[in-house]
Amino acid sequence: MGMYLMRSIGKEGMYKSDLPDFMVFLDWKELPWYWYGFDHFSISLLAILVLPGLFAFVFGYFAFRSRIKGVYFAIITQAMTYALMLLFFRNDTGFGGNNGLTDFKRILGYSLQEPSTKMSLFIITAIVLFLSYILSRYIVKSKLGRVLTAIRDVESRVMFSGYNTLNYKLFIWTLSAFLCGIAGALYVPQVGIINPSEMQPANSIEMAIWVAVGGRGTLVGAILGAGLINVAKSWFTVAAPDYWLYFLGVLFISVTLFLPKGLIGIFDRFSSQNKNKKL
C-alpha cells in the first residue's frame, strides 16, 4: 500500500519527478523492477492479499515441518523480523531507508487530507474488523477451531488421533498473515507513514499486551485490549511523554497480577454473579 501511495504522488513531490522523492534524493535514475505495477491499485491490492500469505506459507511450511514450536518458534520469527527490519533500513533496498515511505497525497484520486476520506477509511477499517471477527468466530466454533484448540493444548494426542497437524497450523498461520496484510494496508494511509521501525520486536510485545489486558482465549478481548492500550498510549504520551512506557508496563503488570483473565474476566465474573442471584 505504501508503494501505491508513493506512486500516486506522481510529479506533485518536492522534486517534481515521476520517481519517489527519496529516490531522487539518493540519485536513483530509474524505478527498481519490484516497484513496477504499483501505480495500479488493482495490482497493489493483489499484492496486499497474496504476498503476506505466500511468505507466511513458505516460512510456516519449513518451520512446522521441522516441528519448531513454542518459545523457539517465537524466537525465530522475531529474529527473522529483526533481520528484515535491518535490511529495510538500508537506503539501497529502495524503500526509503530510515525515513521509510511518507508524504502521501491521495488514494484512488481522493485526497488523504480531506475529512471525508479519513472518515471513509475509518468506516472501511471498522467493517473489515467486524468481518474478520465474524470469520474468526466461525472458525473457533467449527470443527476446525476445535482441532486447532486441541493442537494448542496437546498436539501429540491430536497426531496420535490421525490428524495431520502440519496442515492445520499452516492454514491458520497463513490466514493470520493474510489478515495482517489487510490490516497493514488500512493502517498506512491513515497514519501517513510507514518505515522499518514498525517491524521492531516491541510491536509484537505490544500486541501480546493487548491480548493479555483484554482477555486471553477470547476474540473480543483482543479488540478491547487494543482499544484500551492505544487510548492509554495516546493519553500518556501527551501527559507524560518521558514516562509513558513505564505507565504501560505498570498497566500490563497490574492486569497480569490482579486480572489474569483480563478485562473480559471482570465481565464474566459479574455475569456469573448475576446468574447466581437469579437462581
Regions inferred by a protein language model and the residue ranges of each:
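Transmembrane alpha-helices and adjacent helix-loop boundaries
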Residues: 1-279
